[in-house]
Amino acid sequence: YGTGRDAFVGSVQYLASAPVKTTVENIRAYEDGDKVFLQTVYNFAGAGEQVAFDIFRFDENGLIAEHWDNLAAKADPNPSGRTQIDNYAEVKDLDKTEANREVVKNFLHDVMMGKAPEKTPGYFDNGRYIQHNTGIADGLDGLGAALEALGKQGIQMIYDTVHQVLAQGDMVLAVSEGTFGGAPTSYYDLWRVENGKIAEHWDV
């Protein structure tokens, strides 16, 4: 979509006129200040289901002022039988929002950006890690095996910049950019933090 109300309305009108209607299924939604972040399944005019993360910023009048998103095709269950959207739960630990945001910020710096990889085990509870990435199995071992497999193919997953870290309770969404296999890539990672440890992960 282009910037501005008219560009957005024009795009919506185009979708509305398509022979096959667009469907939207919201999976989960969270709030952080003037921003709302959501996980949603779209099917634009019958083109196939896509899993998305959307971020909306609202202005002082409660109107949508800005939007970011990232989408990927809906895939089959991963090696642990999990999907990109399952395991919904109500948000918890609202009093720990800022502490959980800090856990994820530190994890991004130390692990995902590779500044202190030796700290990786300390971010998990005895290696337990529920994984919804389409190609990675559960556990810290599953993550390590997937990264090793990519390395053998000469593919690097690099995080260069973290743009936003949004949080509500135990749910934290990070918006980052870098490269995957040398190609510029946007990373949207949703983590659930439990007792100060990274417990679960969804991404696009």
PLM regions and their residue ranges:
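C-terminal and inter-domain tail/linker signature
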Residues: 1-204
